[in-house]
Amino acid sequence: MKIASIDIGTNAIKSKIFKTTPASIEFIKGIRSPIRLGGDVFNDGNLSEGKLDQVIETIREYEEVFKENSISHYEIVATSAFRDTANSEDARRYIETAINHPLRVISGLEEAKLIRFHPKSNTGKSKIFVDLGGGSTEFFIRNEEETVIRSFQLGAVRNMLKRDEKEEWQRLEEWLQSIKSKKRLIGIGGNIRSFLNSQGSKEMSLNEFVKKSERLSKLDTEEKIKKYKFSPDRADVIDHALQIFKFIAEQLEIQTITSTKWGISDSIAIKLFHELYSSKVTIS
């Protein structure tokens, strides 16, 4: 059986398709559509009807792909932009009515908690997962005693549009200072992954990360597109994402920075996988 997930993010909409059996789940295909909801939300406070219609059109395109793959089980979630827009509930209903499928707007803490489905979330103590999106940044740390999750309203699109607040930076700094230093930062999201790929690296030391990200920041958007083949919606926000990663890494005295292809759409699919197959188990 194949299943799928759709993640309506702040900078793009993404979907992933998986092949499953009762004992396994395997990634097949991913789709990404550069629809920036954060522009409406952080500039105007609301998601416009035109932008919502773009979301609907995109979901319908994904659903056609699902039909071609005989997929009837899929989940749709929305994150920071949908959380922050003043018309969140009306926007959700508008989309649900059009597509005849539930849309779940998840909180920042739920977004952080979903990182637990990452296959390496249980291994090693001295690492921190940082999921940096367009509108928010989520953290996941698993210690022997507890799991720590946090969410902050700092993100690549939000910061680019100067909608980040000094108080939120202070809140982040205070929290980072309250936790033990970590050796390894595992970055989640297209910006950190694209940056490392553009530099031909799977991981970097903090010093190398700082030097190369500063070098990148000296290029304008067009130069980034030409030299590194970044998409336009990546090239204009990547410096802002890397600035947040740099701040976090320096506060925690991180030794190495790496990335993962994992994202919310993976976690949502894994969660759906468990729900579907556990429902087939009978208890007598």
Predicted regions and their residues:
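Short glycine-aspartate micro-motif
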Residues: 3-7, 127-131
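Acidic, divalent-metal-coordinating active-site segment for phosphoryl/phosphodiester hydrolysis
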Residues: 135-141
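Active-site neighborhood of HAD-like aspartate-dependent phosphohydrolases
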Residues: 4, 17-20
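Conserved ATP-binding subdomain of kinase catalytic cores across diverse folds
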Residues: 25-39, 67
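Beta-strand initiation motifs
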Residues: 23-28, 146-148
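Helical "lid/coupling" subdomains associated with nucleotide-phosphate turnover
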Residues: 17, 40-71, 79-117, 121-126, ...
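Short N-terminal binding/cap micro-motifs at the start of the first secondary-structure element
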Residues: 12-14
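Short, glycine/acidic-enriched loop or turn micro-motifs at the edges of active sites
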Residues: 10, 134
